[in-house]
């Protein structure tokens, strides 16, 4: 399989446009996470102090709306075509970003919630970019094509690296302006570069609501939804809440580290760097998890990844450790969650090969809902106990349930659809 085939076997401009659209959309989707502290300080100067629960709600809303909108945009792709759906969704995102910028320091908490809902359209881009890129290419190139088009998780790393510094120099609202300008640029590129595949290349098979309801009656749909709610939900939940967690827990240590080793006086910028480090592990190791699952089997791989997350989450909740060890534990948690994402999607195509479009939407929605629940749980833990141990214990409990679930389904999977699946189960 050669990258050169991508230019001759399909429509490379569409693949490139889909990659840019998804990558920048993911960056915009998670933008509030690295700005939460700065926005909170801005609201406080106008007399509104966000509680831990309110801060968690603000961070969770883009994840929640993105989860639901994945299914909505999936229907849009079937009815309007991928290109029109993407342009409409991107328009909403651009409007939300410009609104946030122009309101700036005068924006209210309620207005921020509406902006957060608008950013959910960016998170739903997954449901548009992947199908559009895949339509142009033959089955033998689908893995490579979807891997490239879906490599947008790295966008959140860019947020944490650059957003706090931009906010320090020009104000947090300037990050919204940068996001709006970049999104507008991508909108124009996408409008000129992307094309929906013609009928002789791809024959659409529009899905009905009944198709979704039919799959919801299959118990394996719910098992996969649970597993992805833990893996992707854990990844996106921790990613969005990472800076808030670090600032509330290790602000003194990060301040000292920044001054001594980085020459950086702004602890919020230092928190962004450490957040980027941990998130990078989960973003970059997703394909590694898929490769491990190909070799060992998805079930065994999930045992390993979820087992590691369970131990690490309990460790983080119970052991009083140094800042350096805490970052190491968070790094490993994110790494294993990222690899678990790859392992889940090593199994899904083998079980639902004929319904991958629907399953991607359903499981993606479950992942977003899991992320929303994790953010709210961490916010509740901080508000109720002035710490995060309870939140990590609850997350560990959900991971334990997922491990029990894997134990319950592994024999049935391996002796039924796994026999003819063609890959290791």
What residue spans do the PLM features occupy?
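Extracytoplasmic gate region of multi-pass secondary transporters
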Residues: 32-37, 219-287
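Primarily marks hydrophobic transmembrane alpha-helices of the MFS/SLC 12-helix fold
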Residues: 83-86, 112, 302
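C-terminal ends and interior cores of transmembrane alpha-helices
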Residues: 91-105, 307-321
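Cytoplasmic helix-loop-helix junction between adjacent transmembrane helices
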Residues: 115-152
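Glycine-rich segments within core transmembrane alpha-helices of 12-TM secondary carriers
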Residues: 141-161, 364-374
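Helix-loop-helix hairpin linking two adjacent transmembrane segments in secondary transporters
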Residues: 148-194
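C-terminal membrane-cytosol helix-exit motif in multi-pass small-molecule transporters
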Residues: 181-200, 402-410
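Flexible cytoplasmic inter-helical loops of multi-pass small-molecule transporters
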Residues: 191-213, 415-424
């Amino acid at each position: 399989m050669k990258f050169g085939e991508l230019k001759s076997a399909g429509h490379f401009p569409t693949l490139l446009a889909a990659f840019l659209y998804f990558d920048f959309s993911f960056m915009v989707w998670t933008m509030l996470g690295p700005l939460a502290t700065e926005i909170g300080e801005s609201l406080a100067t106008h007399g509104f102090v966000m509680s831990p629960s309110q801060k968690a709600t603000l961070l969770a809303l883009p994840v929640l709306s993105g989860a639901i909108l994945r299914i909505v945009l999936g229907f849009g792709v079937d009815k309007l075509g991928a290109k029109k759906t993407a342009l409409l969704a991107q328009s909403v995102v651009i409007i939300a970003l410009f609104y946030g910028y122009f309101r700036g320091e005068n924006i209210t908490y309620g207005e921020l919630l509406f902006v957060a809902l608008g950013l959910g359209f960016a998170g739903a881009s997954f449901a548009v970019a992947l199908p559009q890129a895949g339509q142009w290419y033959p089955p033998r190139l689908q893995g490579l094509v979807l891997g490239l088009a879906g490599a947008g998780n790295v966008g959140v790393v860019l947020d944490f690296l650059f957003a706090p510094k931009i906010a320090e120099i020009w104000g947090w609202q300037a990050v919204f302006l940068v996001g709006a300008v970049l999104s507008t640029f991508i909108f124009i590129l996408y409008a000129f570069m992307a094309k929906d595949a013609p009928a002789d290349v791809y024959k659409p098979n529009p899905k009905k609501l009944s198709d979704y309801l039919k799959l919801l009656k299959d118990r394996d749909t719910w098992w996969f939804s649970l597993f992805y709610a833990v893996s992707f939900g854990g990844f996106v939940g921790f990613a969005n809440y990472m800076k808030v967690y670090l600032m509330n827990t290790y602000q003194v240590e990060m301040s000292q580290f920044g001054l001594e080793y980085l020459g950086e006086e702004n602890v919020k910028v230092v928190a962004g760097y450490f957040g980027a480090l941990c998130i990078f592990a989960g973003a970059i190791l997703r394909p590694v998890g898929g490769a491990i699952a190909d070799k060992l089997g998805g079930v065994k791989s999930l045992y390993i990844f979820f087992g590691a997350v369970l131990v690490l989450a309990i460790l983080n909740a119970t052991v009083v450790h140094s800042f350096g060890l805490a970052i190491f534990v968070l790094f490993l948690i994110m790494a294993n969650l990222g690899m678990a994402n790859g392992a889940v999607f090593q199994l899904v195509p083998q079980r639902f090969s004929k319904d991958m479009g629907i399953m991607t939407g359903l499981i993606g929605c479950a992942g977003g809902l899991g992320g929303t629940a994790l953010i709210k749980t961490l916010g509740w833990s901080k508000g109720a106990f002035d710490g995060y141990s309870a939140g990590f214990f609850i997350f560990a409990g959900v991971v334990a349930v997922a491990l029990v679930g894997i134990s319950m389904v592994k024999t049935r999977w391996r002796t039924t659809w796994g026999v003819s699946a063609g890959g290791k189960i």
